[in-house]
């Protein structure tokens, strides 16, 4: 019986799955929005939301726990210095998963994963940076 197994295998070995979710977590924390398949997005939520909850309580022990899961100093610094204070008053639900159509090659359902309360970027700023 398959009772109470709350993990998608995603057709990967456990080490590959761990590395993939770690890389996706780092990308999401760095860029604050990523595009991926829907099952990966749902698994990513289970990884990132507890990390942001850790970032709300800045202590050395929490930083070490976050570094143990992310293995990237820049991501841990952003988690505790930017994202923790941003979500200080929110009791959970830090991510938004938007369905994004289907991938051209294999028709896999795609999703856009983004952090809530992202600072808005004006289009004029992007044009000025490009020039």
From Swiss-Prot:
Protein's GO biological process: translation
InterPro entries tied to this protein: Ribosomal_bL17, Ribosomal_bL17_CS, Ribosomal_bL17_sf
One of the record's GO cellular component terms: cytosolic large ribosomal subunit
Record Pfam families: Ribosomal_L17
GO molecular function, one term: structural constituent of ribosome
Keyword list, A-Z: Ribonucleoprotein, Ribosomal protein
Protein family: Belongs to the bacterial ribosomal protein bL17 family.
Assembly with partners or alone: Part of the 50S ribosomal subunit. Contacts protein L32.
PANTHER family referenced in this protein's UniProt entry, alphabetically: LARGE RIBOSOMAL SUBUNIT PROTEIN BL17M, RIBOSOMAL PROTEIN L17
Record-given protein name: Large ribosomal subunit protein bL17
């Amino acid at each position: 019986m398959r009772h109470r197994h709350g993990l998608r295998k995603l057709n990967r070995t456990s080490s590959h799955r761990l590395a993939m979710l770690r890389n996706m977590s780092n990308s999401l924390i760095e860029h604050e929005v990523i595009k991926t398949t829907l099952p990966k997005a749902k698994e990513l939520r289970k990884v990132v939301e507890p990390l942001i909850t850790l970032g709300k309580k800045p202590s050395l022990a929490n930083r070490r726990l976050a570094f143990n899961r992310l293995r990237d100093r820049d991501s841990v610094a952003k988690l505790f210095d930017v994202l923790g204070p941003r979500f200080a008053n929110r009791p959970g639900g830090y991510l938004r998963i938007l369905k994004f159509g289907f991938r051209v090659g294999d028709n896999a359902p795609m999703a856009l994963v983004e952090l809530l309360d992202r600072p808005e970027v004006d289009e004029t700023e992007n044009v000025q940076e490009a020039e």
